[in-house]
A protein has these predicted regions:
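Generic signature of intrinsically disordered, low-complexity, basic-rich segments
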Residues: 7, 17, 27-29, 64, ...
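N-terminal accessory segment at the very beginning of proteins
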Residues: 2, 18-19, 54-59
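Short, cationic motifs built from Arg/Lys/His that form the positively charged side of catalytic pockets
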Residues: 8-9, 229
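Structured, non-membrane catalytic/scaffold regions adjacent to prosthetic-group chemistry
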Residues: 32-397
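Short amphipathic alpha-helical segments with coiled-coil-like heptad repeat character
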Residues: 2, 19-20, 156, 238
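N-terminal secretory signal peptides
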Residues: 1-7
Length: 397
């Protein structure tokens, strides 16, 4: 997005500022369709995004006739806050600094000389499904690069180092406010700073994390973070910092604007004594999610298709109307821990009329994707991290 855009956050606020519980997901999964299938459209369709969000390159799978489990780079969603920076790869270096025993820097050739690792990972924007016009900020790619843990461990952590901050080349101005102890506003100024997010040292040295320079076997495109980005497979997109220039180990909690101000999930948590506590947590790790994406029929045989992601998935369950939960068949992705799973459920002899289809994902530890009336979802007051069970409506003739 260019400088004429307003921020995505402001755009969402201007469109109403109210949490939308019902979300939409468009996915025909044509690659696993039966010959001769006809798609039955859902009654509930996503609304058009407001102009500031029209350039996010959302995945509109119905229109694009998806034919691959891997999302092509040109169809991958693009979310940025300060635009795509101009980075000269020939002069670019990654700095490793802060509370490390051996501060150092790497150019791209030095990183490529390290042992290469690949991971198939479904990257999702933390605002995906928070509003009905944001259903496609997600994609699945094969990412390649150097293991982050090896680079950090070679630098060596000093005893005081507890948190790792990842800085991008994209920069912008942010308002800084002074707030008094009684809540009174003391002052404000604007500061220009690079985009940054952080995680703990233990989280940063997760063996799954990559300093990524390849996407789907090709050089990482500029729009997706070239020459180097962080790929952290257990985390929402906001933590997968693009256009990396600096990694700094610090001795305290990082409170940059995209860590402690903007990307916060606010929940109302009732206590047994009738009081309420409001919690504010930074958007962090991916959450369980599954959606019914398409219903198709051939020779009178109906089938529901969908996708699930966000954690190591053990199984997916689907129910129609108030019927029982039934196990879906995983068609693709079971062998990849961090990638979405495409699934289907045969729906024999459905009655004519309107039906509601709901799916839920269950991970390997037995955690179940929550229902919309679960306190974890019902008490949420922000649109980030929307992972309540999604119900789609369809009408059969």
């Amino acid at each position: 997005m260019d400088d004429r855009r307003i921020s995505r956050r402001d755009a969402l606020i201007q469109t109403g500022g109210t949490l939308v519980a019902v979300a939409f997901f468009q996915s025909p999964l044509f690659a696993w369709a039966r010959p001769g299938e006809t798609t039955i459209p859902f009654v509930d369709q996503p609304t058009a995004p407001p102009p500031p969000l029209a350039g996010l390159n959302q995945l509109d799978w119905e229109a694009q006739s998806l034919d691959s489990w891997i999302t092509p780079a040109e169809k991958f969603f693009r979310v940025g806050h300060y635009g795509v920076p101009e980075v000269d790869a020939a002069k670019w270096k990654l700095q490793i600094a802060g509370h490390v025993a051996r501060p150092t820097s790497y150019d791209l050739a030095a990183l490529k000389a390290l042992p290469k690792k690949e991971v198939v990972f479904t990257l999702e924007c933390s605002g995906n499904h928070g509003f009905p016009f944001l259903p496609g900020a997600i994609g699945n790619a094969r990412w390649g690069g150097a293991p982050l843990a090896a680079v950090l461990q070679k630098a060596g952590r000093k005893p005081a180092g507890v948190e790792v901050v990842f800085y991008g080349a994209d920069q912008g101005e942010e308002p800084i406010q002074y707030i008094g102890g009684l809540g009174d506003k003391m002052g404000e100024f604007k500061a220009r700073a690079p985009f940054a997010r952080s995680m703990s040292w233990a989280e940063a040295t997760d063996p799954a994390n990559l300093l990524c320079y390849e996407m789907n076997g090709k050089p990482l495109p500029a729009a997706n973070g070239a020459p180097l980005r962080l790929i952290a497979p257990r985390w929402f997109g906001i933590s997968n910092v693009k256009w990396l220039t600096r990694i700094e180990v610090i001795d305290s909690r990082f409170e940059g604007p995209f860590q402690a101000q903007r990307y916060l999930t606010v929940r109302e948590v009732p206590h047994g004594d009738g009081t309420t506590v409001w919690t504010r947590t930074a958007v962090g790790k991916s959450l369980l999610k599954s959606v019914a994406a398409r219903v198709a029929v051939v020779d009178g045989n109906h089938r529901i298709y969908g996708a699930a992601w966000g954690a190591p998935i053990a199984r997916v369950e689907v129910k129609v109307d108030d019927g029982p939960w039934k196990n879906a068949v995983i068609d693709k992705g079971a062998e990849h821990e961090f990638a979405w799973k495409f699934w289907h459920l045969d729906w024999p002899s459905p009655a004519a009329g309107e039906h509601k289809i709901t799916s839920r994902a269950i991970d390997r530890e037995g955690n179940v994707q929550p229902a919309q009336d679960d306190p974890f979802i019902a008490g949420k007051r922000t649109y980030w991290e929307a992972n309540g069970q999604i119900t789609r409506t369809i009408k059969l003739s």
